[in-house]
């Protein structure tokens, strides 16, 4: 279990350091071949894949750390690439970290490096055994058949879109592959035609609004009289007044033409009216003394012959008629009271009646 975790960790570290999956696969395969060859030279005849994977991971980590240390030494000396001396210093630095003695601090000669002497002794004593299959150089070159080279501007015979682009660079692909093109035909803008169309739409909307207003006005006027129509209201008021006068005069004639009736029977309606009047005398006096609210009639802007504030005027359309009727009732009560008092004060006239 621990070996598998170490193996996965080694793979992740190697992949992150290389920065490319292809480079990691190539280095991992080369490390497996080298570790297998070393194990075979020592005396191992066969081995399992998990053990080989773990040893390959250790070898890759060691080489990776060696390269990082050598690069840091090169950067300290102001160089961007490391050489053999940087690698020797890195080997001794890794030896010091493991607790062994590398290059002595007293003598800075690289020839006295312990690791370097060990490597020299190993190369001189062992025989080189090549791999069963030669390793290709990295990065692996792609064959000319599988490689698709983009032709340059000169090969195609086109001129670059800008003067700053040289002719030997690869030519650009077709414009439709990298430019955004609309899927529809773009309409040519016509300012004059757009204005005419807007004006036509505006007139159409106004006509629709006018027809709707006419329908509303006709519907309301057919149901109830409109307060803005003052002539109609005045005519209704005159009709109500004439009707009330005819009713009051008819009652007087009918009361005078009665023969053989007693005083109580003749003046019973008047007495009842007087009783009602006496009970609401305070209310009547308050009505008489109440200040009159004068409404100033003014001309308003009308739309299609009707006022704009139609709803407000419809609320008070019944007020003048009810006010006239209340005044007529008060007049009738006062007349009945006056006739009753005259009859009580002059009994001679009462006998004549």
UniProtKB/Swiss-Prot annotation:
<dbReference type="InterPro" id="IPR019473">
    <property type="entry name" value="TFIID_su8_C"/>
</dbReference>
<keyword id="KW-0010">Activator</keyword>
<dbReference type="InterPro" id="IPR037818">
    <property type="entry name" value="TAF8"/>
</dbReference>
<dbReference type="GO" id="GO:0046982">
    <property type="term" value="F:protein heterodimerization activity"/>
</dbReference>
<comment type="subunit">
    <text>Component of the TFIID complex. TFIID is composed of TATA binding protein (TBP) and a number of TBP-associated factors (TAFs) whose MWs range from 14-217 kDa. Can homodimerize. Interacts with TAF4B, TAF5, TAF10, TAF12, TAF12B, TAF13 and TAF14.</text>
</comment>
<comment type="function">
    <text>TAFs are components of the transcription factor IID (TFIID) complex that is essential for mediating regulation of RNA polymerase transcription.</text>
</comment>
<dbReference type="InterPro" id="IPR009072">
    <property type="entry name" value="Histone-fold"/>
</dbReference>
<protein>
    <recommendedName>
        <fullName>Transcription initiation factor TFIID subunit 8</fullName>
    </recommendedName>
</protein>
<comment type="similarity">
    <text>Belongs to the TAF8 family.</text>
</comment>
<dbReference type="GO" id="GO:0005669">
    <property type="term" value="C:transcription factor TFIID complex"/>
</dbReference>
<dbReference type="InterPro" id="IPR006565">
    <property type="entry name" value="BTP"/>
</dbReference>
<feature type="domain" description="Histone-fold">
    <location>
        <begin position="30"/>
        <end position="103"/>
    </location>
</feature>
<dbReference type="Pfam" id="PF07524">
    <property type="entry name" value="Bromo_TP"/>
</dbReference>
<keyword id="KW-0805">Transcription regulation</keyword>
<keyword id="KW-0804">Transcription</keyword>
<keyword id="KW-0539">Nucleus</keyword>
<dbReference type="Pfam" id="PF10406">
    <property type="entry name" value="TAF8_C"/>
</dbReference>
